[in-house]
């Protein structure tokens, strides 16, 4: 039997024969070889190999960074205009401001434009966000002037055929952009200048674009590297196991918590092969290349990295459950170390401790590389080498490789050779086969949380190991420990909701409807008033439960950061409690109810509603609502108020970027006193910057309405399978002071409504009346209304009803109809005939038409549509989820819609000129 060394020599000489994965050599079979290698190691101890990590005694954060390294970070931050954000970090709210740049699809011209260009593109989920190419906007008069004698000479010997060459020559003398910036340097500089919440948002958007995410962020200036655990917590992915036969094949979880096989790719010394390109090929399905990891063949990919060496990136593969599409049958994680392992030993040690297998790419294995890897002789990780050996160094490579084989406990199947003549597709298949073999065998499976534990032991800083973050986590766990059953918790701990709130909302709704009756019976009015007061007295007699009190303490913290940490922890903790269950469509549930003998009251949810932060805030709103009602009726002295501070607490959250509930999703009613209190408090906080434009979005469930708003403005409206589309939420967008005068407002209040059911469901019971009232309210408050549609004739009847009612009142918001391509079909170009069909009332809308006895409204609406008010948006995904990225066509179409909306506001087409006080009055009238 040939020795391992001879086998490797044969493999290298005949590198085109890749063979099959062979069984590994057992450690017991190579004890003699290890002893010989140990003697050779000791003999080389005195040699100057350029490495001092062999004994592993100095593995904590290195404090001896060269002075030149310390200046590189400051130079990069200064170049990018980020030096001012080192003491006071860049925040998420800074990145959301509406400014002149929000209306321009501009290209960066100087390095200081790059961070903002990256954030804008990333907010819009644009796949070109990482492109740091700069374009100088130089007017023709600034082009280099020719010398007079040269110009005269060219006039004498002018030849039309030379025009093209002359143009090229003149352009070559144009001023060139400043020093180009490597995209990885830009990312590192931006993250180092951002607070933890903006970091989290950046990584979330990058994951939607299918970009590799930073896991270990290098910072040579301050002598530490940061493991980004907190920043990754917001990334949630869905996947399906093969085969798609059972309901349990679907999973949705945070990438931080999922334990999966993990494979690391590193470079030792130099390598002719690109790690990142190889990783992209491994992750990409047949005939579709994904550039998940930025590599040398992309724009500026060959630019030298100034501050991003030592960066560790992570990406995942998640299966779709379809064998013909999936590269792997189960989720897997992939790590990529930027830079040489000898210069970034700490990061390499981390990767060896968390990976199922480590792939080392190198062209050279000499004495110093051998000495470096010998220190890993106690490692239990599987190692694979991908070689592209220099012709003159084959013998040296073989000699040291033969010595490493027993040390690392590998055999010839762990040594792969890839040269220019190697079949690339076959090589990628070989790598995938190795990974599948490792995953099938007993191997290390880790989550990002597990990686963070290993990082702490090695001395890396973990970004969530701060007092404020941990205090907020402890408070969240204190609340969640008491939640054993979600439905029971809602009933026992959130007592003011459910049936009491529903009865109160129904009575107040009937009371409000009496104002439209010419001569309402006074006796009926008095009876409704008595019922409302009786219910509010019962609610006011309750005390906030311990869980609600703990929640109020968490969001009332004097530290803004601790408040934000607490809210994020609560969102994730509550989401874990209510993992999404397979659900039938609401149409099916509606048809089943009569058979099951269930209630016919369609104000009840058609699907289980998960417990969320909004339920705790809704409970606070009910306490405030009940107390305010009794004070108005003279049943409670104003001096005995206990909950007057609640609106101020909630408004702080709104200003911090949390969507607040405007319409109660449980009762489909608006708590007028609570919302009025919120708006009054907001008016006080904003002081003189309270001019508002209200933009609302309505539509059928599942049309991507919330995703559209989030992509357009960087908002945080709930999306996904675990959301229950009920009620309406509002979020505030600040307008930059330099732009507010031009735009005509200081703030944009964005309202995202729950889905309005269309078709058969819309005409069932009182549901239509409730949703028509909701649509009337939201459209009546709005300056601009976006109606999201799934089909060209699928305008919800509630929207048409509301339009007709508001037209009678003389209120006409600016309408934009958005048809989203949900099935990845070719998007037709909008034609006037399509617009007319879109607005023609279908037969099942005759009820809305009959109610108002008004046909002109439809003609008016159709007239609006013919003036470019209909948008056809391409499909969201490019490819098949969960590994699909957001399509460039979707991102660009959303940007054009955003620009149109802002132009309409700027040109006064939205009938703005209202402040918060006027909005309060409008709310009361509607």
UniProtKB/Swiss-Prot annotation:
It is found in: Cytoplasm; Nucleus. The keyword Nucleotidyltransferase does not apply. Its main location: cytoplasm. The keyword Metal-binding does not apply. One of its GO terms (molecular function) is GTP binding. GO terms for cellular component: cytosol; nucleus. Pfam families: URGCP. Keywords: Cell cycle, Cytoplasm, GTP-binding, Nucleotide-binding, Nucleus, Phosphoprotein. The modification Phosphoserine is found at residue 3. Residues 689-924 form the VLIG-type G domain. It comes from the Eukaryota. May be involved in cell cycle progression through the regulation of cyclin D1 expression. PANTHER family: UP-REGULATOR OF CELL PROLIFERATION (PTHR22796:SF13), URG4-RELATED (PTHR22796). Belongs to the TRAFAC class dynamin-like GTPase superfamily. Very large inducible GTPase (VLIG) family. This is Up-regulator of cell proliferation. It comes from Mus musculus (Mouse). The gene is Urgcp.
């Amino acid at each position: 039997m040939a020795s391992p060394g001879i086998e490797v020599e044969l493999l290298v000489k005949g590198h085109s024969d890749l063979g099959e994965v062979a069984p590994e050599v057992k450690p017991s079979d190579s004890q003699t070889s290890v002893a010989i290698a140990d003697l050779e190691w000791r003999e080389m101890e005195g040699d100057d190999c350029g490495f001092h990590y062999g004994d592993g005694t100095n593995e904590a954060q290195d404090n001896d960074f060269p002075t030149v390294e310390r200046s590189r970070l400051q130079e990069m931050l200064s170049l990018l205009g980020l030096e001012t954000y080192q003491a006071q970090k860049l925040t998420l709210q800074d990145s959301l401001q509406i400014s002149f740049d929000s209306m321009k699809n501009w290209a960066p011209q100087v390095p200081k434009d790059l961070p903002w260009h990256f954030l804008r593109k990333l907010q819009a989920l644009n796949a070109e966000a990482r492109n740091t190419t700069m374009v100088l906007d130089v007017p023709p008069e600034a082009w280099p002037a020719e010398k007079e004698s040269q110009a005269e000479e060219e006039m004498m010997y002018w030849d039309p055929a030379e025009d093209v060459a002359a143009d090229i020559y003149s352009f070559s003398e144009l001023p060139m952009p400043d020093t180009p910036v490597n995209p990885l340097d830009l990312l590192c500089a931006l993250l180092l200048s951002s607070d933890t919440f903006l970091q989290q948002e950046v990584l979330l958007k990058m994951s939607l674009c299918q970009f590799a995410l930073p896991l270990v962020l290098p910072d040579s200036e301050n002598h530490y590297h940061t493991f980004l655990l907190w920043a990754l917590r917001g990334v949630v992915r869905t996947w399906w196991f093969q085969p798609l036969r059972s309901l349990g094949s679907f999973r949705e979880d945070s990438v931080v918590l999922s334990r999966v096989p993990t494979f690391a790719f590193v470079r030792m010394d130099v390598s002719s092969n690109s790690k990142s390109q190889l990783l992209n090929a491994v992750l990409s399905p047949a005939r579709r290349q994904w550039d998940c990891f930025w590599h040398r063949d992309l724009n500026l990919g060959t630019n030298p990295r100034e501050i991003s060496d030592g960066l560790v990136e992570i990406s995942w593969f998640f299966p779709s459950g379809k064998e013909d599409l999936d590269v792997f049958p189960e989720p897997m994680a992939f790590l990529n170390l930027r830079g040489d392992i000898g210069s970034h030993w700490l990061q390499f040690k981390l990767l060896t401790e968390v990976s199922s297998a480590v792939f080392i790419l190198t062209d050279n294995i000499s004495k110093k590389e051998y000495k470096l890897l010998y220190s890993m002789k106690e490692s239990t990780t599987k190692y694979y080498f991908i070689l592209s050996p220099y012709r003159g160094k084959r013998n040296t490579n073989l000699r040291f490789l033969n010595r490493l084989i027993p040390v690392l406990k590998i055999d010839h199947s762990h040594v792969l050779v890839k040269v220019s003549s190697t079949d690339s597709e076959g090589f990628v298949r070989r790598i995938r086969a190795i990974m599948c073999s490792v995953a099938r065998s007993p191997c290390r499976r880790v989550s990002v949380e597990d990686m963070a534990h290993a990082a702490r032991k090695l001395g890396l800083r973990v970004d969530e190991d701060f007092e404020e973050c941990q205090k907020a986590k402890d408070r969240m766990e204190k609340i969640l420990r008491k939640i054993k059953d979600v439905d029971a918790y809602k009933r026992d701990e959130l007592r003011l909701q459910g049936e009491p709130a529903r009865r109160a909302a129904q009575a107040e709704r009937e009371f409000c409807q009496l104002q439209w009756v010419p001569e309402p019976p006074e006796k009926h009015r008095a009876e409704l008033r008595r019922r409302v007061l009786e219910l509010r007295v019962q609610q006011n007699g309750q005390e906030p439960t311990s869980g609600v009190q703990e929640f109020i303490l968490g969001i009332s913290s004097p530290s803004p950061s601790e408040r934000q940490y607490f809210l994020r922890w609560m969102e994730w903790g509550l989401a874990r409690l209510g993992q999404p269950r397979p659900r039938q469509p609401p149409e099916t549930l509606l048809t089943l109810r009569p058979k099951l003998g269930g209630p016919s009251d369609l104000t009840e949810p058609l699907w289980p509603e998960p417990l969320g932060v909004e339920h705790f805030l809704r409970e606070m709103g009910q306490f405030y609502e009940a107390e305010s009602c009794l004070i108005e009726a003279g049943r409670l002295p104003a001096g005995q108020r206990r909950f007057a501070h609640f609106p101020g607490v909630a408004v702080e959250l709104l200003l911090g970027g949390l969507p607040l509930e405007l319409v109660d999703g449980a009762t489909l009613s608006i708590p007028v006193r609570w919302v009025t209190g919120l708006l009054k408090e907001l008016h006080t906080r904003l002081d003189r910057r309270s001019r508002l434009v209200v933009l609302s979005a309505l539509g059928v469930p599942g049309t991507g309405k919330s995703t559209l708003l989030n992509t357009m403005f960087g908002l945080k409206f709930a999306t996904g399978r675990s959301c229950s589309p009920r009620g309406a939420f509002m979020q505030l967008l600040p307008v930059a002071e330099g732009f507010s005068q031009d735009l005509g407002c200081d703030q944009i209040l964005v309202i995202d409504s729950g889905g309005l059911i269309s078709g058969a469901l819309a005409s069932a019971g009182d549901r239509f009346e409730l949703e028509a009232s909701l649509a009337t309210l939201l459209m009546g408050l709005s300056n601009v209304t976006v109606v999201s549609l799934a089909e060209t004739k699928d305008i919800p009847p509630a929207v048409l009803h509301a339009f007709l009612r508001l037209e009678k009142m003389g209120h006409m918001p600016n309408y934009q109809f958005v048809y989203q391509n949900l099935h990845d079909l070719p998007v037709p170009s909008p034609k006037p005939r399509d617009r007319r069909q879109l607005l023609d009332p279908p037969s099942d809308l005759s009820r809305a038409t009959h109610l108002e006895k008004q046909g002109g409204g439809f003609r008016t609406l159709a007239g609006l549509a013919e003036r470019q008010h209909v948008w056809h948006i391409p499909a969201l995904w490019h490819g098949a989820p969960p590994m699909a990225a957001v399509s460039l066509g979707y991102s660009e179409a959303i940007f054009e819609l955003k620009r149109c909306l802002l132009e309409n506001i700027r040109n006064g087409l939205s009938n703005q000129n209202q402040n918060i006080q006027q909005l309060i009055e409008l709310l009361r009238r509607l």
